[in-house]
Design a protein with these regions (language model features):
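Residues immediately within or flanking Cys/His clusters that coordinate Zn2+
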Residues: 20, 28, 65, 89, ...
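Cys/His-rich microdomains that often coordinate metals
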Residues: 1, 30, 75, 98-99, ...
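Terminal recognition/anchoring or ligand-binding modules at protein termini
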Residues: 94, 109-111, 122, 137, ...
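Short cysteine/histidine-rich zinc-coordinating motifs and their immediately flanking basic loops
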Residues: 6-15, 35-43, 80-86, 104-108, ...
């Protein structure tokens, strides 16, 4: 993972900075406890730009068991819900933070939403396959929605 410093919200305590750990190969971001909420709107745009600049990195699938970078204990898969949909994150039981795939982060921030059943059916009539946002593998949308 690479560390990147982005602007945080200024809560009257001076200019805040948020340091995120980003894995471009596995397309994931480690957020220390509640760090995802501390990003300023400009920092979210900066982060999307950074992710776009590294879009050609060779991708690695996520490991079956992810570990907290602070305590090395296993992360537990869980879901969060926002207006744009439900998305998966991997949490540390010790509340050190969470790991989020780039695609989940985009859902969290409202830039991406899940397709409705009617939209999936319409897309399945027009295309044979879509590609996994995690590993890039083709997915037959007529049968599956994820790899």
């Amino acid at each position: 993972m690479e560390a990147h410093r982005l602007d945080g919200h200024d809560h009257g305590l001076g200019h805040g900075v948020v340091e995120l750990d980003i894995c471009f190969a596995c397309q994931g971001i480690w957020f220390d406890h509640r760090e995802n909420l501390k990003l300023s709107p400009q920092a979210v745009v900066e982060l999307f730009t950074l992710l776009h600049q590294h879009r050609t990195y060779e991708r690695r699938p996520l490991q079956r068991q992810l570990a907290c970078p602070r305590c090395v204990r296993p992360l537990a898969p869980s879901f969060d819900v926002v207006r744009s949909g439900r998305y998966m994150v991997y949490r540390c039981a010790q509340q050190h933070g969470r790991f989020s795939a780039f695609s989940s982060f985009m859902v969290e921030k409202g830039f991406v939403r899940h397709l409705t059943r009617a939209e999936v059916d319409d897309l399945a009539r027009r295309v044979d396959a879509i590609y996994c946002t995690g590993c890039g593998s083709p997915v037959d949308i007529r049968k599956d929605h994820a790899c």
